[in-house]
């Protein structure tokens, strides 16, 4: 199985082109092996590119634990560049089918520098759409208990669930303790991604992400979008915000409540390889 290793701000993926080669029957099991950083290639996710009847191509993502998230913002940027460079598409504006619906990345050319701006779609704010247990309505500044602490959380779905926490002031040990506790909190029947946010200014935030099924990750595109939406909903940030993640910076824009969120950032190829294990 031939693959390409790529990353978006350090969030790394094994990209497999399913247009010209056969793929395994159990991609979740393959992801557990391929993503292992000691015994496999090592990655935050396995990404399969497949034909689509509804879009230019279809993307499936599998976490290191074998689970399949609905979407991945960093992976979609990698996929857009891969598809154009490998001749799967000739245009700079793509449509990609995902479990979260159609996602529309656009490759922006500035000399020899390529970045990707992605129409991530409208955020989903109703509790049932997150999904999150409890009474109907948006979840903004709601208290959740985890361990011996209480957190004020805002829940946003960008096709996958996010629990955004502002001002928790956690050290690394606290991040690694409360991130997984909130991920599996009973309020979230499908588990959740967790973002801990420090507001630096109305146009800039610093974020650490505990990714569902992954753990600490250097970057999360859907998480950055969820943070920007939560910042607007709670009056903490502007509609155009630079999100500083451990792996780098994403520009997130949410022009109006009724419209989509836009994410802009880089993606990089690392190497090509061949998986020879049965």
Swiss-Prot record:
Which keywords does the record carry? Answer: Amino-acid biosynthesis, Cytoplasm, Isomerase, Lysine biosynthesis
Q: What class of enzyme is it?
A: isomerase
Active-site residues, Swiss-Prot/TrEMBL: 72, 220
EC number(s) recorded for this UniProt protein: 5.1.1.7
* Cellular component terms per the entry's GO annotation: cytosol
One GO MF annotation is: diaminopimelate epimerase activity
Principal subcellular localisation of the protein: cytoplasm
Instruction: Please indicate if the UniProt record lists Cytoplasm as a keyword.
Output: yes
Question: Pathway listed for it?
Answer: Amino-acid biosynthesis; L-lysine biosynthesis via DAP pathway; DL-2,6-diaminopimelate from LL-2,6-diaminopimelate: step 1/1
Localization, UniProt: Cytoplasm
* Record field: catalytic activity: (2S,6S)-2,6-diaminopimelate = meso-2,6-diaminopimelate
Note the site residues: Could be important to modulate the pK values of the two catalytic cysteine residues: 162, 211
Binding sites annotated in the UniProt record for substrate: 11, 63, 73-74, 160, 193, 211-212, 221-222
Biological-process GO terms, alphabetical: lysine biosynthetic process via diaminopimelate
HAMAP family reported in the protein's UniProt record: DAP_epimerase
User: In UniProt terms, what function does this protein have?
Assistant: Catalyzes the stereoinversion of LL-2,6-diaminopimelate (L,L-DAP) to meso-diaminopimelate (meso-DAP), a precursor of L-lysine and an essential component of the bacterial peptidoglycan.
How this chain assembles, per its entry, is: Homodimer.
Family, per the entry? Belongs to the diaminopimelate epimerase family.
Q: Which NCBIfam families match?
A: DapF
Q: Give the protein's recorded name.
A: Diaminopimelate epimerase
Say which species the protein is native to.
Answer: Desulforudis audaxviator (strain MP104C)
């Amino acid at each position: 199985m031939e693959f390409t290793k790529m990353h978006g701000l350090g969030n790394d993926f094994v990209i497999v082109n399913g247009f010209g080669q056969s793929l395994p029957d159990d991609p979740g099991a393959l992801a557990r092996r391929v993503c292992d950083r000691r015994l496999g290639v090592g990655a935050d996710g396995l990404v399969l590119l497949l034909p689509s009847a509804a879009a230019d191509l279809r993307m499936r993502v599998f976490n290191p634990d074998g689970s399949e998230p609905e979407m991945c913002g960093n992976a979609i940027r990698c996929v857009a560049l891969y598809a154009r460079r490998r001749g799967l598409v000739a245009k700079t504006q793509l449509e990609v089918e995902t479990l979260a619906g159609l996602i529309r990345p656009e490759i922006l050319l500035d000399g020899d520098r390529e970045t990707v701006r992605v129409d991530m779609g409208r955020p989903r704010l109703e509790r049932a759409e997150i999904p999150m247990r409890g009474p109907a309505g948006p979840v903004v500044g709601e208290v959740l208990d985890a361990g011996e602490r209480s957190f004020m959380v805002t829940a946003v779905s960008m096709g996958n669930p996010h629990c955004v926490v502002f001002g928790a002031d956690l050290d690394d040990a606290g991040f690694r303790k409360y991130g997984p506790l909130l991920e599996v909190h009973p309020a979230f029947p499908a588990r959740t991604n967790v973002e801990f946010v420090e507001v630096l200014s109305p146009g800039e935030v610093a974020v650490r992400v505990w990714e569902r099924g992954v753990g600490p990750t250097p970057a999360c595109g859907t998480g950055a979008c969820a943070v920007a939406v939560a910042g607007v909903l709670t009056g903490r940030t502007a509609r155009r915000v630079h999100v500083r993640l451990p792996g780098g910076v994403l520009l997130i824009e949410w022009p109006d409540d009724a419209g989509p969120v836009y994410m802009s950032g880089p993606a990089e190829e690392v190497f090509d390889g061949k998986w020879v294990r049965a």
